[in-house]
Every structure is written in C-alpha cells, then in structure tokens.
Amino acid sequence: MSNLNDFNREAKAALWVALQWLLLAVPTGLVCGAVGTAFHLSVEYVTELRAAQSWLLLCLPLAGLAIVALYKVTKCEGVGTNNVIRAVQSGEPVSLLLVPAIFLGTVLTHLCGGSAGREGAALQMGGSIGWNVGKLLHLSDYVRRTATISGMAAFFSALFGTPLTAALFAMMVEDVGLTFTSAFMPAFTSALIAYGVSLFFGIAPTNFVLNSIPHLTLETALQTALLGIACAAVTRLFCWTLHTLEHGIPKRIPNPWLRAFAGGAAVVAFSYLFGVGRYNGAGMAVIADAVEQGVALPWDFLCKIFLTALTLAVGFKGGEVVPSFYIGATFGCAFGPLLGLPAGFAGAIGLVCVFCGATNALIPSILLGFELFGGQGLELIALGCGVCYMLSGHHGLYSSQLFVTEKLLSEYTESWGKRFRK
C-alpha cells in the first residue's frame, strides 16, 4: 500500500511540474514568436531597403551614435549574450529593456550596412523575455533559469524555423559538456509554439538544397576530416579576431560616441574598398550561393571575419552566429574542391563546422545540419563537426561559456571543479 501511495505522490508531483512547464512554455513561446516574427520582418525589410538605396551605407556612423544613445537611455550599456548565459548559469537578472535596445540597435545596424547577424540578438531578446516571464509568474530561481532557456530557444526557432536545434542549443550553450535535460520539454514546447507563430505570419523556415552530395566512403570521410581540421583553424581565427578587436578598440578609443562614429566610418570605407553589399548585413544571399550554387570568392571568409569583428567591436548590434554561417560556407566552398569535395557540399559542411567550433555546441550543430539540409549527407556533416569541435580549442564566441569537461579528455575542467565545490 505504501508503494502505491508513493507512486501516487510521485505521479501528482510530476503532473504538477508538467503543468508548471506548460504554464511557462505557452506564454514564452507566444511572446517570443510574436516579437521574433516582428524582428525577422523588420531586419528583412531594412535589408531590402538598403539594397535598393545604397546611400544608406553612408549613414552608418550616425546609426552608431543613435545606438550608443539608445543603450544609454535604456541603461543596457555593456549588456549582451554573455549576460543571458550567466542568467542561466547563476540566475543573474536580465533587464526587459534589453529587448527594445537590441531590437532597434540590430535593425539600425542592418539598415545602414553593419556586418552582423541576428541570432545573437535573438538569444538576448529571448533570454530577457523568458527570464521576465519567470519573474512575472513568481517562479523559483531554478525554474526562472529554465524560463530563460525556453525564451532563447523560442526566439531562435522563430527566426530560423529549426525548433529542435533551437531547444538543444539553448540547453547546451551555457556549459560545454553539460546538458540541462530538465529544460528540454519547456524549451522544445516554447520553440514549437514560436515556430508555429512565425509560420502563421508567413515566415518560411531557413533551409538549403544541396545539388551534389557524395556517398560516404573512406575517401570522402578523409576529405571531410581534412576540411574539419581547416574549419577549426578558421574558427580559431574568427574568435581570436573578434575578441582581440572587442578588447583592443575600446582601449584605444574609450569614448563610445567617437568609437561608434569612427568605427562606422571604417566599415563604410572597407565596404567601398572590397565591395558594397557583399560583406554588409547578415549575408544570407552569399551563404545561399555558396551552398546551393557552389559559388564564393576565395577571400570572402577573411573579409567577413574582419568586418564582423570590427562592426561588433565598435558598438553596433546583431550577432555572430549568421556571420559564422557565412564564414564557414564561403571557406568550405572555396577550400573544399581542393580536397576533392563538391563546392556546394563543402560549403554546407563548412557552415555547420564553423558554427560548431565557434559556439562549442556539437550536438545542436549536427541537428542544425539535419534541419537546414534535410538530412542530406548528414554522416559526413557530423564527421566534419566532430573534427572541428575537437580541434577548435577552449575558445568561442561567448566568454562566459563554461567548459565542464575537456574537449579531448573525459575529465572535468578546473573551473568547473571550483564552481561545483561552491
């Protein structure tokens, strides 16, 4: 009888937790889906407007001043994706004012041609919305962290139409080697709801068609492994450039107003020197050309690395994830044929590999390859990801990311041990 009572108590407790997750996931998914849809449409509109009105690029220095003012008014100076990651790790609060700040800042950046993505902004907005939904519902600190993960997953899903990748990425990006499995159902539910909202408003999921897919053989496996090694080197270069400029430029130009104006002018000059439009914005058209048509310039990835690092270092907003797609796709497309791989397929491998190495999220990266390319060539994509992940080092886009285990050894890191002992 006692066993039956224990079973009933456990069942009731589980039902109550499931109800809590549902109460959390539904509003988070709806709000993030709506805001994410508005954000997607806004960025898409200003990107088309800039393409039609090329003179808008000349306004980038002024846009930089407007972004500095916006962040001062909202008191969000210095707040970014690292703060959202820390909100999951330690319960650090995230201001709701971050949502309008990063929304408008990213739209201004894309309107005037800054080289940035949108997923970093999505993680910030989603994390902020999720954390504040948890606060509004008076949830415990632990559950509020789950709400933050759910918001990140929902916003990512609304923008890219990849709900499974979004949920796993939001669960795993904070602590490398640790999966916040209890957050899966609320995160995945929020991601599905947000995805449904974006579909309702006519936003098609991001996917690519691969025209030439080699069979899995010993030869293609070796070629893919070599490409994965090269992508690891590119990932290290991207992260090093990003962090070097983000730390170096503010030291050289401590005044944020001057930094934004001068940095914006430098981005404009670079764009006119190397090609207006090709390296500005997120670059989804260039990514599509590299993956679907097998067309990219050999220096595309280097130009995108520098211009993205410069754009973000001087104070413009957006993200690093889509630029990592661009860098990987163009590098793979240009370098892959030298190894004997089809250019487009090598671009697909490069896209996923550099994303994997830059975010240190192995399983979500493989799932991303499945959702973006429909499962085509998944074994080779997974192989490339594994090699790149293993060799890209303990670096990444997010400095607050904590490595729980070593990449090459099944051992806990010293930093994780210190945190665990606390």
Residue ranges and their predicted role:
Residues 1-422:
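Alpha-helical transmembrane segments and immediately membrane-proximal extracytoplasmic
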